[in-house]
A protein has these predicted regions:
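Anionic-ligand binding patches
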Residues: 2-4, 11-136
Length: 136
């Protein structure tokens, strides 16, 4: 079975393809010229993964898997959260890291608890399957 991965991140695609080696399914990429991806307007990682997976599955008429993930910092009330990838105006890893460190200035080491949250959602023909994990 082929499952289209609802991302244009080639690194992420390679990771999923590696995980599926030797299995009875394979992950395939979306065409790079797909420009109509919907905005991630959800208020949770799960909602954003659903938006992407549903759109891609219905567009290509095949099973799709989407993920949404990010960093949640307790001292910042869960920020950057769903905005992790676009936390800074530059929307780059370096820019996001710099903004996070600026916002953490003055926060004591013992109050710097955080977690990385990843939500995976599969969608096909109106049915969903969902999994979520965190790394503290």
């Amino acid at each position: 079975m082929k499952i289209i991965l609802a991302t244009q991140n080639q690194g992420k695609l390679k990771e999923f393809q590696q995980l599926s080696k030797g299995k009875n399914f394979e992950f395939i990429s979306m065409p790079e010229d797909l420009k109509d991806m919907p905005e991630e307007t959800g208020s949770t990682f799960k909602e954003n993964a659903f938006i992407k997976a549903k759109y891609v599955s219905e567009y290509f008429e095949m099973p799709a898997l989407a993920d949404d993930s990010g960093l949640e910092v307790d001292a910042l009330n869960g920020a950057p959260g769903i905005f992790s990838a676009r936390y800074s105006s530059s929307r780059t890893d370096l820019g996001n890291s710099k903004k996070l460190l600026r916002n953490m200035r003055g926060v004591a080491k013992e109050n710097r608890a955080a977690r990385f949250r990843c939500c995976l959602l599969g969608f096909h023909k109106g049915k969903t399957i969902f999994s979520e994990g965190t790394l503290e």
